[in-house]
A protein has these predicted regions:
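Polybasic "coupling" helices that flank or enter modular domains
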Residues: 115-153
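ATP/adenylate-binding site constellation spanning eukaryotic-like Ser/Thr protein kinases
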Residues: 47, 69, 104, 126, ...
């Protein structure tokens, strides 16, 4: 079975070039620090590992995935919460993580103007949907071991 990855390196390079050109500040967060996703900023993981989870209405935490290296953490959380009434939680799992912090308004304005960034966002959502569907197929079609293996895959 072919492994599905987030987005192509070329698209990621375009996002990094934009962030560096605009001189977007880099935040350095320490292990077990949580990000506040209710503010008006977007976070792009540059280095490190973060855990993405959802806080359900009854306050249980449901772990979704771990993200490593370059990834738009806020887009991933937007994917998760678009159709659910739950709150995303992002926690730093590496010793330190470096994240770009940009205003959502500024980012989406730039996405509308730049075809490369628009392509990145579209590809990101499409690939995340493919990954979710593939994991669900493996879980549904297999036993308990298959369910565990689908998340390790």
């Amino acid at each position: 079975m072919k492994m599905i990855t987030g987005v192509s390196k070329m698209c990621c390079d375009g996002v990094i070039q934009y962030l560096e050109k605009e001189k977007i500040p880099i935040l350095i967060k320490n292990r077990h620090t949580c990000l506040d996703l209710n503010d008006s900023n977007m976070y792009v993981l540059k280095k490190g590992i973060v855990k993405v989870s959802l806080i359900m209405q009854d306050e249980r935490e449901f772990n979704i995935t771990y993200l490593q290296g370059l990834d738009v953490v806020s887009l991933y959380c937007d994917c998760l919460t678009q159709f659910r009434d739950c709150h995303p939680k992002i926690r730093i799992e590496s010793e330190q993580a470096e994240l770009y912090c940009i205003s959502k308004e500024k980012f989406y304005k730039r996405v509308k103007e730049d075809a490369n960034l628009q392509n990145y966002v579209d590809t990101y959502y499409r690939n995340r949907l493919k990954l979710a569907i593939t994991r669900e197929q493996v879980m549904i079609m297999n036993s308990k071991a298959g369910a565990v293996c689908s998340w390790l895959y």
